[in-house]
């Protein structure tokens, strides 16, 4: 009887160890990514080196017609059921490009709404340029201080695996920077047979594949975009200091020179939307 119990116990232990090893092999890079989450003296500012495969090359080939499709892709491809916490919130914001006293180009942006932690996410994809992007965790329903704990491996922190798809602004290794902002009006012209991207994945697509503003504009105009309410426009700037705002108009996608943008349309002086007091 004792031998039988011992045998059964050994079998269960072997199964448990085998399951654990398989889990580690399947999720090693995801676990490594979650564990490297760091915090700083600045309140609710985090950084993350992203080691896992976030499947972006595959994603931009097929795209997502709306945020729901993007969320479903993330759940299946990235988190594999580890994290389910996703929501999409609206924003108001400002962005501008200036030179400092040394003649260096500075790209600035802010979010004009309530509390939200930010994870600065560094990625270095095999088929694209290295970049650092800001992921606003308010999009992922983090609304309380201290919800995210650095160096913790838990289901709450597993949500950071979604960060590459919630890049609201960032800069790549060539100094190309980009941000997305709400605006009052947008008319979308469809490009036949082109994939559709969400606003945040459009930023990542550009920053992983363009070195300067000209390359960014060309890439930008080769994709459709899902502009669910509120509508959006984009600021793009490169290391030379050149900056443009991309807007969707009755005439299609328009890129025009501007060093400041908030939440109203700049094209054709329509000025529809909010944020004129910040402009």
Walk through the language-model features, giving the residues of each.
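N-terminal mature-domain region immediately after signal-peptide cleavage
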Residues: 7-211, 226-228
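Generic ordered-secondary-structure signal
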Residues: 93, 186, 201-205, 209, ...
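A sequence-level detector of short, solvent-exposed, charge-rich linear segments
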Residues: 126, 225, 235-239
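Extended amphipathic alpha-helical segments with heptad-repeat/coiled-coil character used for oligomerization
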Residues: 230-279
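Positively charged n-region of N-terminal signal peptides that target proteins for export
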Residues: 1-7
